[in-house]
Amino acid sequence: MDQLIQLVEATQERNDIPEVRPGDTVRIQLKVIEGEKERLQAFEGVVIGDKGAGTSKTITVRKISHGVGVERIIPVNSPNVESITVVRNGKARRAKLFYLRKRTGKAALKVKERKTASAQA
């Protein structure tokens, strides 16, 4: 039974999604259906945690909108996710960045930048 589940999940998993880690700033294009129309809605924020693996992986993204903190839990393999783009690589020393919830203003999104191999070359 376990092999059957793994086989089905392997066919359902998306390969076009980049590796996202806590601390990264990402821009996610989500499909939104309003009546008969379908449009894309961008959501840009800091990844404060991830959960699960494979087809059930989710990421929690936080942004500040008009002075109010907004968090969305986004299933990575959802058909409503058009694309995920990493805007900035962040350096986090823990897996869950829930301490950002207590911060206000610019400090609420402040995470040090991670140096990547491509940036150093």
UniProtKB/Swiss-Prot annotation:
SUPFAM superfamilies: Translation proteins SH3-like domain
Top-rank taxon, per record: Bacteria
InterPro entries: Ribosomal_bL19, Ribosomal_bL19_CS, Ribosomal_bL19_sf, Translation_prot_SH3-like_sf
Keyword field: Ribonucleoprotein, Ribosomal protein
NCBIfam families: rplS_bact
Entry's family note: Belongs to the bacterial ribosomal protein bL19 family.
Name of the featured protein: Large ribosomal subunit protein bL19
